[in-house]
Swiss-Prot record:
Stretches that traverse the bilayer: none
Protein name: Chaperone protein DnaK
Residues with PTM Phosphothreonine: 176
Induction conditions: By stress conditions e.g. heat shock.
Superkingdom, natural source: Bacteria
UniProt gene name: dnaK
Pfam families: HSP70 (PF00012)
Amino acid sequence: MASNKIIGIDLGTTNSAVAVLEGNEPKIITTPEGGRTVPSVVAFKDGETQVGEVAKRQAITNPNTVASIKRHMGEAGYKVSIEGKDYTPQQISAMILQYIKGFAEDYLGDTVEKAVVTVPAYFNDAQRQATKDAGKIAGLNIERIINEPTAAALAYGLDKTDKDEKILVYDLGGGTFDVSILELGDGVFEVLSTNGDTHLGGDDFDQKIIDWLVDGFKADNGVDLSKDKMALQRLKDAAEKAKKDLSGVSEAQISLPFISAGASGPLHLETTLTRAKFNELTADLVEKTRIPVENALKDADLSASDLDVVILNGGSTRIPAVQEAVEKWTGKESNHSINPDEAVALGAAVQGGVITGDVKDVVLLDVTPLSLGIETMGGVFTKLIDRNTTIPTSKSQVFSTAADNQPAVDIHVLQGERPMAADNKTLGRFQLTDIPAAPRGVPQIEVKFDIDKNGIVNVSAKDMGTNKEQKITIKSSSGLSDDEIDQMVKEAKENEEADKKRKEEVDLKNEVDQLIFTTDKTLKDLEGKVSEDEVKKAKDARDALKKAQDDNNIDEMKAKKDDLNKIVQDLSVKLYQQAQEAQGAQGGADSNAAGNANSAKGSDDNTVDGDFEDLDKDKDKK
């Protein structure tokens, strides 16, 4: 039976998390390993797919490992080629979502079909559509896509809905950066503005350390580690660890023995990275986040002094230099009351509760991050919906023809902020045809934009004279067709079945190993205690099972395992009965001996009393 719960998923660049509403509180669902976040890593090995911690652990030795795929969501034509097969970012993301769905179902004890998934506030339409496609491939109905900073504010504001506050959410994750300004009052979360950079995050901070290590090693040893894939993965792991360590200590030791080899033998990397040096290396990245903060405040028509609360979200906000910079820019001490790795998933779970009706009196009013419009005469970008407009929203405008007797108009839909169409991102094109012949400027063409609650765009063009209408739901240029999505859903399900089958086979082989071991032990214990025929029967069954195991014949293993199991159980019962009989015989002999001893004392009924008397005497002696 499917659960009516809607899980909240933070599909992150480096780590993901999932939460569910229990009672009135959102709760993180832990991974099978007990972790509270899932590394957004997928590995392929011999046709098997691994996701999460296990995939991340073997990344050094397995080149078929994919990480930070979120950076490529919505990217036209981008694919990763693994073991002779191409995968889109949607498919890789779907594998992560499928894994999350699986352990969430184990926790809830029900099938999970619905989810709220978060995206960076500055994700464009193509990236949002790709996220929805990934959910569909994973077998999840994405009930709502919400912006990550908005989700963080939901987690923060759940128990503070009686306050009127202006909140700045500074969200620096593994691969993306967002800043949003929200107003919270009477249970309404209204997003006033949003800004950011979808290609800036903790990965870039790691890269600065990696570059520093590579340059230093090259200067000392004349070896370029950036050309060595395995060394590079070790450097990445060491850089990430050093970055995390420097959030708590002033210097971090980096020790990588046998990182390479030179003419005189193995080479080792041993160095110390101080927090001061780290701050120097990454100062430009921290500074890069300042402009979006200023722009978001400007778009919300606020100054830093108008802010009541500053929330830091995303694991990279643990970096002390980031915290200091945000506090300096805003003049406010940042709020650390929420775990920055978990807030987004918790907020998504709250939104799930809003949708199911479990959370009352909370309304989320999100915004579109970029302006939307069409190309008009002269290649001009004419905006119909300005950025930071609250969604869902609808806007229409009447246009006309540019030439006499023009039979059709091309509707070129764009997203962006530049005045010329060529400088903005194309979302789609369609044509309205069969316009009756008329002088230029006479036909009335109504163009209407609709943005739904997920930020997905629908555009229509209607000839007011004939009522002829043409519509388009914007799919990104990298979006997948329904057929492609259906095929990927099918493949994902097939892989799920294959993975399940593979696990069952491994479990069966383990059971067979254990049974053969138990049989050998039982036969040894039964030596000389059962007939030769029974021993032969057991040995034959054991050998038949061993042969099936050696042949890797799954069906035979199942059948022979059941046969041997029955024989071993029967023998074990016999062994137990023999032990009981032997114990009974021994017990009888002991009773007779005790009875004879008592008779010699001339007592008729003193066996028990005799025992007690002896104990009492012992007590008296003490």
